Each structure stands twice: as C-alpha cells, then as structure tokens.
C-alpha cells in the first residue's frame, strides 16, 4: 500500500487494454487484397473445412481472415473488406471478411440474418 506522499509523487499507473484486432490499428474495417484462399480444419470436438483467406491489408500488414457463409467467389487478388472478430474453433484467426462489400459477393439463397451476409431481399 503506497503512502499519500508516494501517490502525490508518482500517481497510479493506468493499465492499457490490449486490442483484440491490432492489425486494424483502431479502424472499424480495413481494405485488403487476398494473397491466398484456402481451407482449414477446426479445433477438437468440431470437424469441417472452414474457408479462410490470407489478406494483405492497405497498411501492409498480412492477416488470416475467415470467409463466413456458404460458398464464396473469392480468389487470389480479390479486394475485400476485413473487420475484427475471431472464430472460436479456428486458432489464430482474429478477423472476418465482410460479405457483400467490394469483391466479396453476398451469400446466395439466404433468407434469415441477410444483413450479416450481404444478401439482397428475396423477390416475392
């Protein structure tokens, strides 16, 4: 326990909170170019081939981002918008690609949660 005098001299040190998406450098989203598009297997109890892309952001940092939704049109040199947000069963993946923005098309035949997947309203 510090004395009053020690607190007057030095004060309390503020603990800075660590960013969960440091590559975005405080921005909500960043534009990037796909360097590699591939699949990855999730951690133990789950089994699948999750779609991922290695993206070089506009600030020069290269990150691995998850491609959400069923099916995608991304390939090398596609320009994408990346946001923060991890995928719980893929270690080391802390970013997601925004569907329906730039070169990433929205998910086809999506009826619910359309705004999260860039899907247009279906015709009646």
Swiss-Prot record:
This is Small ribosomal subunit protein uS12. SUPFAM superfamilies: Nucleic acid-binding proteins (SSF50249). Coiled coil: none annotated. Belongs to the universal ribosomal protein uS12 family. It comes from the Bacteria. InterPro entries: NA-bd_OB-fold, Ribosomal_uS12, Ribosomal_uS12_bac. GO terms for biological process: translation. The modification 3-methylthioaspartic acid is found at residue 89. With S4 and S5 plays an important role in translational accuracy. Interacts with and stabilizes bases of the 16S rRNA that are involved in tRNA selection in the A site and with the mRNA backbone. Located at the interface of the 30S and 50S subunits, it traverses the body of the 30S subunit contacting proteins on the other side and probably holding the rRNA structure together. The combined cluster of proteins S8, S12 and S17 appears to hold together the shoulder and platform of the 30S subunit. Transmembrane segments: none annotated. Keywords: Methylation, Ribonucleoprotein, Ribosomal protein, RNA-binding, rRNA-binding, tRNA-binding. GO terms for cellular component: small ribosomal subunit. It holds the Pfam family Ribosom_S12_S23. The keyword RNA-binding applies. Gene3D superfamilies: Nucleic acid-binding proteins. CDD domains: Ribosomal_S12.
């Amino acid at each position: 326990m510090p004395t009053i005098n020690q607190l007057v001299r030095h004060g309390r040190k503020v603990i800075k909170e660590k960013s969960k998406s440091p590559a975005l450098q405080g921005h909500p989203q960043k534009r990037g170019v796909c360097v590699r598009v591939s699949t990855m297997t999730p951690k133990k109890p789950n089994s699948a081939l999750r779609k991922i892309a290695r993206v070089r952001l506009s600030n020069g940092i290269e990150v691995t981002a998850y491609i959400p939704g069923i099916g995608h049109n991304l390939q090398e040199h596609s320009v994408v918008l990346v946001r923060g947000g991890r995928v719980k069963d893929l270690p080391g993946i802390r970013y997601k690609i925004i569907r329906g923005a730039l070169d990433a098309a929205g998910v086809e035949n999506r009826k619910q949660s359309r705004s999260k997947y860039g899907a247009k309203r279906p015709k009646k």
